[in-house]
């Protein structure tokens, strides 16, 4: 076997994904400790975790950016290279999770043994389904009071619709948790506290656990029989003839096909269970060789599909999945190489910009420290320096064999705040700092209000913007004043309107002329984009070359609705007919006619204001539930359901307009004496009632007269 192929076979690109407090970063830290990359274990609760490298992360104890780390692990005599991506679990940062999942081959879904499947676990699980990422489950915090491995396994099945397949069961729970039973080898593993869990012993299963272990082994074999014919045959004839090797092959096969999720458990904080988790990563998660060939399109012919296999001899194909600013080396671009390889000092083609870029240096990252590399090969994750123009989602490839990979889609920001520098000298620094941060984060936008000159920054939630302001202060030394949060409203129309628009201009010499008849109406329910444009012009009444200009005019005009200049969403425009002048008509005339048609038709089409609605989940003690629901009702919330958690707390699910959620965390703390927690994420846009629309439009001096 060629050395390169061997290298691919022993590479794992994995992410650790979970709810905010399930212990992702702690687990990552233990992996770095046991694989020999760190000599002191970092703890998230004392702010020394290696993976949480931004100052705000260390203060807040949560992970914001996905730090990518390369480490090694010896398993069955082979040295495995593990590229580990630590992903955030807070809903304001789901975009970071999406980015990571796009470039991973497999994932470790971490669950808290006490909290089980929490709201964010569901979100992340759905994201991993979307990208077809095989996963193994790790039930962490087995040492905590209320830990229940079997209940978490049940929740995976019932809440997530997963097919959990325990390959370990715990020995003890809460303070008596001391090891696991390996159901494949039918042995007990005990970790030694005196070596901080670095050493463990493999022993016979304690007699009092033997029957339970056999029962769970049988359940494991039954799950494997469903996805492997060879096991099924032996399982029904004589299960005792199934060999350890056959079980390992079947688990790997079922995991890669996403038919099962092998389940392991441990307590990362107490240094138990991490080595067996690493073994499971090497044994069951895919190598780049196990992933299908990546598909892209030909930049010169977007209908032509190109595939690239994960081979070193294929032309270079890589995806930029994150841009970060490093204080020492400048702009760092993280990328995943799907085919071929990148050499330091070489040129690559960016198919979005159409430009060749020279990569001056290459690194592999250990959290935020760089290890210089000469080459980053197929199936690997690395970072490069030297890019002049690079964005998240760009394809980097060989200029002689261009390819464009599917770009990444990011949600639109839903909340904005106005910012201004405290002093005049901060003015330039503010602009530069915001531009750099917007480059790093595709869900963060910066706009300048042309009328007021105000700078408005927008993001995915209050925490997201807090952290941006914090980074401006720390990294760019800019102090700024901030306004109160503003909601990013949208506009929509409710009725169809048909209209003829003629644009004519005569000023001596060649004039301007365009004549269009359009029907404007709300887009079809199933339509995903912003503008659904249909051309029904017959007989060349409008020449083909002018039709894209009509579409372009509507696209431009939709950015500013007639009520208050908010963008329009989901519009259907049908170009029915029109006429042109052989001398005076040009592309610009048709574009202007479309812009005017939009403005005139919108005012007659029942324009309405749309507001972002958030999906909220509040976990509260029973005795505070009445107050919590009363408060949500006051905030125009719609309670959709209530559940009881394992610990007896009540879980309230509601849809609440974003405009009513500002300061909610503080209010919730007050009404429940700090005993409730909440999480929310964007759900959809919905029409605002006329009384509230008038209030909003009065604030922004919009067209209140158009609201019925």
From Swiss-Prot:
Matching InterPro entries: EFG_II, EFG_III, EFG_III/V, EFG_IV, EFG_V, EFG_V-like, EFTu-like_2, G_TR_CS
A Pfam family recorded for this sequence: EFG_III
Family, as annotated: Belongs to the TRAFAC class translation factor GTPase superfamily. Classic translation factor GTPase family. EF-G/EF-2 subfamily.
Gene Ontology annotations for the cellular component aspect, listed alphabetically: cytoplasm
Organism expressing this protein natively: Parabacteroides distasonis (strain ATCC 8503 / DSM 20701 / CIP 104284 / JCM 5825 / NCTC 11152)
Ligand binding (GTP): 18-25, 86-90, 140-143
Residue intervals of the tr-type G domain: 9-289
Protein name, UniProt field: Elongation factor G
Keyword GTP-binding set for record: yes
Keyword Chloroplast (UniProt): no
């Amino acid at each position: 076997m060629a050395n390169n192929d061997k290298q691919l076979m022993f590479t794992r690109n994995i992410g650790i994904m979970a709810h905010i407090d399930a212990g992702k970063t702690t687990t990552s830290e233990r992996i770095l400790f046991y694989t020999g990359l760190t000599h002191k274990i970092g703890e998230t609760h004392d702010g020394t975790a290696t993976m949480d490298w931004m100052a705000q992360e260390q203060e807040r104890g949560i992970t914001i950016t996905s730090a990518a780390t390369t480490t090694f692990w010896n398993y069955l005599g082979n040295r495995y290279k593990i590229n580990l991506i630590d992903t955030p679990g807070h809903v304001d940062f789901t975009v970071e999770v999406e980015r990571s999942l796009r470039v991973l081959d497999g994932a470790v879904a971490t669950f808290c043994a006490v909290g089980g499947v929490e709201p964010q676990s569901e979100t992340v699980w759905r994201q991993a389904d979307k990208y077809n990422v095989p996963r193994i489950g790790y039930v962490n915090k087995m040492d905590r009071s209320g830990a229940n491995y079997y209940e978490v396994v049940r929740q995976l099945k019932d809440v997530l619709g997963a097919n959990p397949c325990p390959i370990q069961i715990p020995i003890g729970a809460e303070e008596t948790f001391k090891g696991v039973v390996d159901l494949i080898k039918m042995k007990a593993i005990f970790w030694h506290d005196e070596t901080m869990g670095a050493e463990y012993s493999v022993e016979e299963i304690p007699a009092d656990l033997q029957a339970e272990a056999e029962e769970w082994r049988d359940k494991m074999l039954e799950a494997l029989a469903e996805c492997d014919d060879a096991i099924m045959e032996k399982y029904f004839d004589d299960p005792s003839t199934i060999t350890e090797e056959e079980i390992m092959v079947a688990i790997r096969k079922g995991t890669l096909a996403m038919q099962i999720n092998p389940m392991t458990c441990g307590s990362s904080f107490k240094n138990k269970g991490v080595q067996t988790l690493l073994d499971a990563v090497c044994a069951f998660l895919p190598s780049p060789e196990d992933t299908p060939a990546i598909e892209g399109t030909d930049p010169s012919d977007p209908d032509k599909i190109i595939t690239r296999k994960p081979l070193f001899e294929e032309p270079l194909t890589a995806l930029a999945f994150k841009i970060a600013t490093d204080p020492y080396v400048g702009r760092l671009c993280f990328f995943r190489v799907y085919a071929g390889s990148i050499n330091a000092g070489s040129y690559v083609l960016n198919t979005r910009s159409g430009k060749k870029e020279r990569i001056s240096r290459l690194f592999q990252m250990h959290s935020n420290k760089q290890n210089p590399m000469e080459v980053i090969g197929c199936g690997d994750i690395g970072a490069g320096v030297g890019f002049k123009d690079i964005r998240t989602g760009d394809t980097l490839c060989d200029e002689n064999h261009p390819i464009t990979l599917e770009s990444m889609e990011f949600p639109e920001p839903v909340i904005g705040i106005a910012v201004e520098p405290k002093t005049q000298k901060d003015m330039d620094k503010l602009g530069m700092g915001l531009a750099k941060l917007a480059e790093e984060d595709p869900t963060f936008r910066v706009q300048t209000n042309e009328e007021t000159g105000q700078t408005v920054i927008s993001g995915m939630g209050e925490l997201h913007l807090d952290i941006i302001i914090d980074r401006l202060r720390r990294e760019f030394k800019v102090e700024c004043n901030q306004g109160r949060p503003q909601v990013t409203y949208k506009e929509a129309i409710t009725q169809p309107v048909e209209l003829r628009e003629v644009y004519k201009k005569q000023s001596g010499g060649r004039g301007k002329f365009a004549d269009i008849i359009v029907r404007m109406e709300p887009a079809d329910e199933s339509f995903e984009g912003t503008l659904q444009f249909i051309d029904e012009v017959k007989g060349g009444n409008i020449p083909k070359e002018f039709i894209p200009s009509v579409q372009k005019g509507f696209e431009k005009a939709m950015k500013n609705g007639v009520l208050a200049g908010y963008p329009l969403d989901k519009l259907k425009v049908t170009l029915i007919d029109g006429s042109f002048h052989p001398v005076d008509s040009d592309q610009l005339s048709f574009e202007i006619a479309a812009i005017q048609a939009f403005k005139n038709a919108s005012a007659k089409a029942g324009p309405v204001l749309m507001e972002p609605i958030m999906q909220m989940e509040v976990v509260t003690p029973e005795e505070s539930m009445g107050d919590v629901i009363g408060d949500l009702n006051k905030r125009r919330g719609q309670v959709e359901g209530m559940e009881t958690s394992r610990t007896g707390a009540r879980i309230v699910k509601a849809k609440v307009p974003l405009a009513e959620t500002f300061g909610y965390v503080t209010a919730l703390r007050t009404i429940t004496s700090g005993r409730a927690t909440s999480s929310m994420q964007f759900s959809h846009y919905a029409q605002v009632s006329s009384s509230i629309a008038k209030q909003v439009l009065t604030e922004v001096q919009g067209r209140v007269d158009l609201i019925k």
